[in-house]
Amino acid sequence: MKLRSDYVSNSSSSSFIVINKEGIDRTEEISEEFSPYNEPWQHYLVPCKNGKHQFGWEWEDSCSFESKLNFIGIQLLYLFIEKIEGRDREYSRMYTGKDFDRLYDMLKKVCKEKFHFNVELNEDAIKTHISHDDKKGYYGWRCMNDEFYIDHQSASSEGSCMEMFESEDALYDFLRFEESYVRGGNDNG
């Protein structure tokens, strides 16, 4: 068994992902459960309220397919926000908005080819704020809806917990095996 993981820690939370290459393979079960989303006009929206959709404030392992798919969807939406706002970190090895298209296409391909359903990012998980200051005047900024989040330093915008996107096989293994999971924690109490 080969384990791959990423670890993040800050003053309030810690999280990491574990990707196993063997274990209880749920591919057939997932394909059957998500078969209503197999038609070209049907898409399963992520993140959604099926499964865990808030990560980083509780000590727990999230190993359900829906929870892992939500985690991935939230990570991708953080990158999408960076893309549409034109934020880049050229000085960093971290993922940026420039990576969004490639990673989103990878998720759609794995869901369609391996699990036989269509997936789409849930645009309603993003909200826009209008702010004002004396120098800029009115300006807008985007963030995730409060219902869906990954604690700040465990998110893709901080370059964390993205190893599932190393390859299509890694993404498939992360999603299909019950022994692959997201572990979250909190040291606030």
Label every PLM stretch briefly.
Residues 6, 13-189:
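Long, non-globular targeting/processing and low-complexity regions
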Residues 1-4:
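Short acidic, Pro/Gly- and aromatic-enriched capping/linker segments at domain boundaries
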